Amino acid sequence: MRILSWNVNGLRAVYKKGFVEAVARMDPDILCLQETKLQEDQRSQEMINFDTYQSFWDYASTRKGYSGVAVYARKRPLANRCGFGVERFDAEGRVIELDYGRFVLFNIYFPNGQKDDERLHYKLDFYRDFFSYADALKDQGRSLIITGDFNTAHNEIDLKNPQSNKDRSGFLRIERDVLDDIISRGYVDSFRYLYPDTVKYSWWSYRFNARKNNAGWRIDYFFVSEDLMAEKVVQDAFILNEIAGSDHCPVGIELDF
């Protein structure tokens, strides 16, 4: 099974930049999208009934053209839900949960901390409350796959210019500590686990020819519960730098299912 995650930075925009062809090339069984920036009535029929996939959507109720996540899946899950039961976070349309029995998949657009203390606290609170929810499932023996745009680069290897960005949200020590804590609680960064020394990025600013110069950040992840690595269910993890259309590129994992 191949699962991909891609922050498209506007689904309508990326449809005009070769989205259909890119998905055909990547051929995922499940495709998780972040920052769709859509309301329910803004979806085209092509978006709803894309190829052979079933689609699942979550939208921001706080304002239009903001946030939003979607999942395209070839196989219908046993159950699905939006959000995780905390209204201040669920209102921004950031989470889809799909239960496939063997594993539970979360597609998440984690908040951006920005330069604003209020949004940084919101981001940190989101991390805390979501992973408390995830921990409860894991404690019940569920295998978890948590993917999406985490909006944080974990270590210096995960961005081109760590020193000049150490005071910028996305690489603040307090944000990086959260990822340390997630790992200590039994979640594995699948790409870094399999490729400890590989330098690859998943996001580049639109400014300063950042993508051309590969001045990027790795902020898109597949975190999985430890059992999926220990049992070698996760066969590979990868970053598809060659896929254009957004300021992010897709990331993915291959599972032995």
Where are these regions (language model features)?
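Short catalytic/ligand-binding loop motif for oxyanion handling, primarily in non-cytosolic enzymes
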Residues: 12, 40-42, 64-65, 114-117, ...
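Active-site beta-strand/loop signature of hydrolases that rely on acidic residues for catalysis
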Residues: 7, 23-41, 105, 134-156, ...
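Structured beta-strand-rich core segments of catalytic domains in phosphoester-bond hydrolases
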Residues: 37-39, 45-113
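Conserved beta strand-loop-helix elements of the APE1-like EEP
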Residues: 64-80, 198, 210-231
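Metal-dependent phosphoesterases centered on the DNase I-like endonuclease/exonuclease/phosphatase
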Residues: 30, 51-54, 126-215, 219
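Active-site beta-strand termini and strand-to-loop segments that position acidic
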Residues: 74, 98-101, 225-226, 246, ...
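Surface-exposed cleft-lining segments at the edges of enzyme active sites
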Residues: 85-86, 111-127, 163-167
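N-terminal, active-site-proximal structural segment of metallo-dependent hydrolase catalytic domains
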Residues: 1-50, 57, 61-69, 82, ...
